[in-house]
């Protein structure tokens, strides 16, 4: 492996603002960078990212790589992948982390293929082996009945991290990271899809994907009427409300 000098996390933004999972993977990356004695960088892909860059710095990133283009304002898989590939090839990180989100599930496997490196997905823990300085990534296997710890031996040592595994670090308003813009030249023809409209879903209470406690029901409740007591309980607990499949 080359002696690459950074841990790189690929953050996610919505309308130019960090989404909560980015704080979680910055925390995971900060731990790894400290164990390795190297710097932590956060890559942000989108448009109008000044606010997101400032927020990422206050959460623990030393360096911010910014890839802005109006074509990246809304997620389009092929364009996002092109930008992520350019970033990783330019930076050549030692460790690369993404969140196990819909974007991470879409992009990470194809990014790994482009970089010609293995990928460990859906990790519950990432840490550095003190003796080899290699990434150890722990993930569930056999339907969650066992855990496997995978040693990564090729740079970038690439893993996706499950949401809600790491807590974001406390915000430090005084932190200011180094901001480095990276030019990304995108051709609209690269995209195989087109965003024609965006509809914001309004929901009451805690969003399910952000909830630390979930109150769930199943078919036995019979229908919407049966879920109303669960909603009251969820409100009392500050929980999200879900359903079994």
Locations of the language-model features?
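N-terminal glycine-rich FAD/FM-binding segment characteristic of electron-transfer flavoproteins
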Residues: 1-245
């Amino acid at each position: 492996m080359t002696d690459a000098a950074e841990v790189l996390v690929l953050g996610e933004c919505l309308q130019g603002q960090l989404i909560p999972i980015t704080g979680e993977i910055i925390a995971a990356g900060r731990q790894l960078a400290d164990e390795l004695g190297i710097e932590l960088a956060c890559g942000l892909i989108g448009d109008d990212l000044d606010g997101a860059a400032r927020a990422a710095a206050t959460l623990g990133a030393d360096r911010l790589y910014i890839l802005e283009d109006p074509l990246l304002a809304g997620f389009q898989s092929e364009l996002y992948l092109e930008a992520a590939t350019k970033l990783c090839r330019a930076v050549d990180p030692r460790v690369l982390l993404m969140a196990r989100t819909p974007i991470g599930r879409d992009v990470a496997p194809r990014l790994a293929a482009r970089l010609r490196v293995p990928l460990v997905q859906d990790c519950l823990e990432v840490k550095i082996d003190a003796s080899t300085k290699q990434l150890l990534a722990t993930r569930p296997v056999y339907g969650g009945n066992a855990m496997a710890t995978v040693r990564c031996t090729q740079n970038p040592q690439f893993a996706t991290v499950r949401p809600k595994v790491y807590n974001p670090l406390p915000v430090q308003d005084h932190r200011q990271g180094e901001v480095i813009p990276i030019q990304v030249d995108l051709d609209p023809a690269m995209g195989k899809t087109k965003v024609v409209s965006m509809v914001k879903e309004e929901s009451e209470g805690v969003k399910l994907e952000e909830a630390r406690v979930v109150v769930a029901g199943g078919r036995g409740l019979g229908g919407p009427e049966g879920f109303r007591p669960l909603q009251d309980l969820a409100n009392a607990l500050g929980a999200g409300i879900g359903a079994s499949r």
